[in-house]
Amino acid sequence: MGEETTIMGTVLSVVFQNEENGYAVLRLVTDDGELLTLVGCVPCAAPGENLTATGSFSSHPQYGEQFSASEVERYLPSNETEILNYLASGVVRGVGPATAEKLVARFGIETLQVLESEPEKLTAIKGMTARRAQEISAAFNEQMGLRRVMEFLAHYDLPAALSVPLYRRFGANAMAALERNPYLLSDSAFGVDFSVCDEIALSMGFGGDASLRTEAGLTFELSHNRDAGGHVFLPREKLLAATAQLLDCDVDAVEKSLDDLIAIHRVVQEGVANVTACYLRQSWEDETYVVTRIEAMLADKPDALRGVERVIKEIEREQGVQYAPLQRQAVELAAKEELLLLTGGPGTGKTTSVRAIVALFERMGLNVLLAAPTGRAAKRMGELCDRDAQTIHRMLGMTFNDQTGEVTFTKGEKEPLEADALIVDETSMVDLSLMRALLAALRPGCRLVLVGDPDQLPSVGAGNVFSDLIRSGRIATVALRDIFRQAEQSMIVRNAHLVNTGMPPKLKNAAANDFFFLPRRDSVRLVETVVELCKTRLPDKMGIPADELQVLTPTRRGDAGTRSLNFALQAALNPPKPGKQERRFGELVFREGDRVMQTRNDYDVVWQKEDGTAGTGIFNGDVGKIAKIDPSGELLEIVFDDRTATYTSDMLAELDMAYAMTVHKAQGSEYRGVVFIGAPCAPSLMVRGVLYTAITRARELLVIVGDDSAVNKMAENDRRSRRYSGLKWRLRKGGEEK
């Protein structure tokens, strides 16, 4: 990239336009008469527009010189020729070349003003009805609205790409919504820091409107603690104190605004256990709905399955197994109960139990569905059970509502799943909102078996659902504890169970062939060792290719964090070479062959499978491989398991390298080999749950590199971050009232 400069010019043609995120490739004639290609975020670009763009020039072998724009300021066409080109491009719905000629011939330089505010004049054109005139005017004003939003964002140095989700949410009212309440930008859908929103609001003259600011601060604290901390609610006193600190004001000033929000039902206040709990309304509705549905399932006794004992014996005989007492109990309870929780660590026979339950249900003529929270977990579940398994989102028919910016599901109470039984694996990853959607999609009488390991890290989203369901004591639960003889030979399994009981793992064991510890206290040597393991030692000596190894670390920061490790691993495993395309984005260089990870939910990414099946949505934590980068560097083809998605270069902000990832991001996945960094890090991450989850990600081989004292400290530290949730309390309370 060259030095940053500013150019001015007129759009001649639109080579490419991504309607979802506003990314465009434009042919431009500059005010100096030069022809060039401009790439950047220019939503709804059209020929005839005048632009002032800030950015830098770069050169590509195939496409020549390009100008990559970081900021774009747009102006309406200023003469009749430019207006004609602009309207003839089709940028305004209902206006084609012929209509554009008639409009400009009639109104000349005033054409755009007529379209914006005097649509009744359009009926002077032959064949133009009053209704069509209003439709064309509305379409034009929609374009102007988007332009004004972009100008607003540019004025406050916010990315132009924000205009797309804003316009999706508010449509033609987007600018009015921002002018009415700039704090809406702090919503998690837009992700602007509250302090930035505060500065914008003050510059817009909102300094005197204390209630708007305090209400925004309160809802920000509730949503931020939900999204970042997993809290379903906050205690009233904690919410007031946190908001007062955020706004640098007295608690008394915040308290009235909280009561106002409660009065209009944007916040729900309710006694939960011994706490005065404050919920965002949606969180309260999710929690109470889950409780209501579970209470209904507990009250309902499904139709009895006859001959269960006989069928179990038949399955044992056919599969050549004999179920342990707890496994048999799990199968029997699945036949009797509408809701069953099945838990257990590695090697305790969860998979065998699930297979038995599936076989029993199918023998009894039930239609069985299998699902898991992530694509990798669903794929593994399907392979182990020799059945089709889907992600929960796909099973429920997830869709993204462009108007509200919300995720919705086609399956629900009005259109339930066609299933007599549903088995969900990795349930500890299911957050409260997804559990609500799942329960809503079950028809009355459908059996539900939730399988998981409550000792792993909780869901990324709000709540601690699986653990709360277990600890409520209301739901039939089978906890598999005994390690089977075959699994007992594995040091991975044995050490996982040691850690889970608070004992340090056995790091030195000459007889081990699947668990190794390499002491490295110096960070430079640690990184060198990790690179050596992944590049040569483990592929050569253990027969596990680098593509099937995963480096896990508790943290993103520091020498032993994902950032440093990914730089080192990319340089070793996928170095640059002639003919291999790459694209720089910030401090990262994305290269063909790189392993990458999606870092946020993007419901608009279009993907396709080899069989032609297509869909949308790539989610936070999905890992893929860059198969191809267009020579221009503007389009990337990424393969996520069996799905291929095309990314434009401005979408690279959603990606990170994935040679190394945090343990949290690895939840729900399993790898042939894992290299875990057991080095000192932030106290909040030096906990048993992180170590246990890391160990249980390894299927065939685990190598811990680091400091034995740090590993032992993690095993001993059972501190779990508290998540405010009323689910367990509500279920217990419901049981006491019966």
Locations of the language-model features?
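C-terminal accessory regions
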Residues: 613, 620-738
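Conserved lysine of the Walker
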Residues: 350
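Conserved helicase motor core of P-loop NTPases
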Residues: 454-616, 627, 734
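Hydrophobic anchor at the beta1->P-loop junction of P-loop NTPases
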Residues: 342, 370
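N-terminal pre-P-loop "Q-motif" helix
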Residues: 320-336
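Hydrophobic positions on the alpha1 helix immediately C-terminal to the Walker A/P-loop
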Residues: 353, 357
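Accessory, non-ATPase domains that flank or precede helicase/AAA+ motor cores in DNA-metabolism machines
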Residues: 1-307, 316, 738
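Conserved helicase motor core of SF1/SF2 NTP-dependent helicases
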Residues: 360, 364-366, 372-384, 393-401, ...
